[in-house]
Amino acid sequence: MRVLLSVCGTRGDVEIGVALADRLKALGVQTRMCAPPAAEERLAEVGVPHVPVGLPQHMMLQEGMPPPPPEEEQRLAAMTVEMQFDAVPGAAEGCAAVVAVGDLAAATGVRSVAEKLGLPFFYSVPSPVYLASPHLPPAYDEPTTPGVTDIRVLWEERAARFADRYGPTLNRRRAEIGLPPVEDVFGYGHGERPCWPADPVLAPLQPDVDAVQTGAWLLSDERPLPPELEAFLAAGSPPVHIGFGSSSGRGIADAAKVAVEAIRAQGRRVILSRGWTELVLPDDRDDCFAIDEVNFQALFRRVAAVIHHGSAGTEHVATRAGVPQLVIPRNTDQPYFAGRVAALGIGVAHDGPTPTFESLSAALTTVLAPETRARAEAVAGMVLTDGAAAAADLVLAAVGREKPAVPA
């Protein structure tokens, strides 16, 4: 048996797919993954066949680059859907089920292909701000009508904008393969009941949300840390880690620079993750060390605190490691996870994406306090570690209930 995983998103989304692929492999199920070109090396490491689908995002979104004009945004939006119809049919050949992770627009195309082939379809998204709910508004960088505060209305507007942007391309491509048009484009992409790969302590399922919360899909990372990093860790007290992952755009380099200054003022050493923005150290002093991608599960257990952007992936790894966190949210679901860190008492949520020396100094005082460390370690013991196993069981249970393929 083989299952197709289709991922459209950042490295964190790819890791969600990798965790599920690993669990399915343990159950004797083969997988292949449609994923962005940048995922090639990671998928080769874990032995998952890779079907490149998408654009090299980390090359498109560099620090200081202006956003594309509206017509280019619309072209890219159409491409997101088009690429699924072009690549997924071939990738799904011989597969018994399809799981989409990440971008909802891509998921509408992936589900259409699964529908055509009569395959069970699951959609997975790790954040509640992407699932319509009367309790949480849409992601905070979504455009809204001035003066509208009713959460239900905000979600209705979100669904209408989504349909306007992606519906024409979706329904044109569906017609080409003999499928009827979709009216509720936003709801269609979610599938019959989304899988929610988020930990119930860190991101509890809200009432009235029809989803299956499996717990986080996390692959145990057994890779050793690089020798140079091990030497830096051994040379002094636990440092503070700074990293913004696959975030990019204006202000990240400045935020990292201010963070280094604030950490040094506390008498602490620094580890700086370069990330997609390719951050650089401010100088050549021996109290700072720059790294590329490493085993963060191992590293986070050996640092004094973690300063990060609040993505779902980084948030789950840091929380599971029991390390205090200072979250500087920038967009999408990051303010939600920053708020959860503060609510759980395992760190501090910075007010906005533009830190100052003063704001970070105050936050670090709380983050580095012994009581914050104790609370972070206590919460780490509550985090579920078998989310991918629960998801794999759901997928395999659905394989025997697939619908017949739609005739050409």
UniProtKB/Swiss-Prot annotation:
Biological-process GO terms, alphabetical: carbohydrate metabolic process; lipid glycosylation; vancomycin biosynthetic process
Reactions that this protein is recorded to catalyse: dTDP-beta-L-vancosamine + devancoaminyl-vancomycin = vancomycin + dTDP + H(+)
Annotated positions binding devancoaminyl-vancomycin: L76, T80
Sites where the protein binds beta-D-glucose: D13, D103
Keywords: Antibiotic biosynthesis, Glycosyltransferase, Transferase
Enzyme class at the top of the EC tree: transferase
Keyword match Cell wall biogenesis/degradation: no
Pfam family, one: Glyco_transf_28
SUPFAM superfamilies registered for this protein in UniProt: UDP-Glycosyltransferase/glycogen phosphorylase
Record: residues binding dTDP: T10, R11, G12, S246, E293, V294, N295, F296, H309, G310, S311, A312, G313, T314
GO MF entry, a single one: hexosyltransferase activity
Keyword Transferase: yes
EC number: 2.4.1.322
This protein's pathway: Antibiotic biosynthesis; vancomycin biosynthesis
Function description: Catalyzes the attachment of L-vancosamine to a monoglucosylated heptapeptide intermediate during the final stage of glycopeptide antibiotic vancomycin biosynthesis.
Miscellaneous comment as given in the Swiss-Prot or TrEMBL entry: In A.orientalis different glycosyltransferases are involved in biosynthesis of the vancomycin group of antibiotics. GtfA (AC P96558), GtfB (AC P96559) and GtfC (AC P96560) are involved in biosynthesis of antibiotic chloroeremomycin, while GtfD and GtfE (AC G4V4R9) are involved in biosynthesis of vancomycin.
Family: Belongs to the glycosyltransferase 28 family.
Protein name: Devancosaminyl-vancomycin vancosaminetransferase
Protein species of origin: Amycolatopsis orientalis (Nocardia orientalis)
Organism lineage string: Bacteria, Bacillati, Actinomycetota, Actinomycetes, Pseudonocardiales
Protein's gene: gtfD
